[in-house]
């Protein structure tokens, strides 16, 4: 069986052992690059609603369009994971940004279903390259919980702005205004690419473990199957994210909630989720990453089951706030867990691929359920089941780590 060498603790690593990716400028560049990689995925509810209103697509067709974006995210992430260890990351990021710019422009030029699906696929590929380069670069830091908390904190702020500004843009320019927003968002990011380190200094998959006292070396062998199982869990959890996030706006409309109420709830839900990044960092230092992750997944299952029973103003608000908070919370720990195992970014670069694959499949699955008149409760039950699978996998991984690498199992 293959093995990976990993660390027992990285937090007190000495300055001379810091990588280029620990530098504030590098973290800043990677985080800003994440804007272009996650904008469509995080703004998906309002984008889907805008395409429905502006272009008149059915729910099944909207599922295909959402899946096109997410399939592109998968393809871009896989491409990046294959080349990120050896290719200049500035070049990768530039290619991704140019694809985002061109594809969003072409999305405004043809409103027919198939050409628009191709444009959204291309935009997704560009976003996948950007996001994978972002996560692989942040994984090079020796304080994963901190760097990914910073990333998600900033992305939540950006997403709150998106939920505020998108209804205004849609009312004036329709869905083409949203495509142009993503285009103009990507252009200035090209200017900060020189701040991004070109390569990962670590050429191998082995990671030297530095003890808390920073005085001895400890190499712990972890079965290769464990990080791979973590990627499967990411995929399973993002089936929830893809289905819920693509159709929660439509579920609110079906429950006769006003568009103002829906967009306002989405906006405040994102603002509230900022506390998730801060709490995640505090809990990681106090309890490690695994236990809070298991708790958060359990709460997410309960949230989906409540929404499956009834969608009204109360359950809609509860689900948005719970989902927004724990989604960010869970992402911090998922990314942090893989980064504790592998600083080279190989597995972290695969996270967007797993997210993209799940989010490519999930809207289509949800759309099929809805096309059979099974209602939004069937979508929420599907989300709960997918999250339960992720919970089981992470529980198994945690138990195995307690046996082979207890310091990593409860690492922050």
What kind of region is each of these model predictions?
Residues 119-153:
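Cytoplasmic helix-loop-helix junction between adjacent transmembrane helices
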Residues 129-142, 328-342:
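Intracellular juxtamembrane helix-capping segments at the cytosolic ends
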Residues 141, 150-201:
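Helix-loop-helix hairpin linking two adjacent transmembrane segments in secondary transporters
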Residues 76-89, 276-289, 370-371:
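Helix-to-loop junctions at the C-terminal end of transmembrane segments
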Residues 45, 226-267, 271:
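Extracytoplasmic gate region of multi-pass secondary transporters
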Residues 341-375, 383:
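A late C-terminal transmembrane helix in Major Facilitator Superfamily
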Residues 287-334:
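C-terminal transmembrane helical hairpin of 12-TM major facilitator-type secondary transporters
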Residues 75-112:
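Conserved MFS/SLC helix-loop-helix module at the cytosolic interface between two early adjacent transmembrane helices
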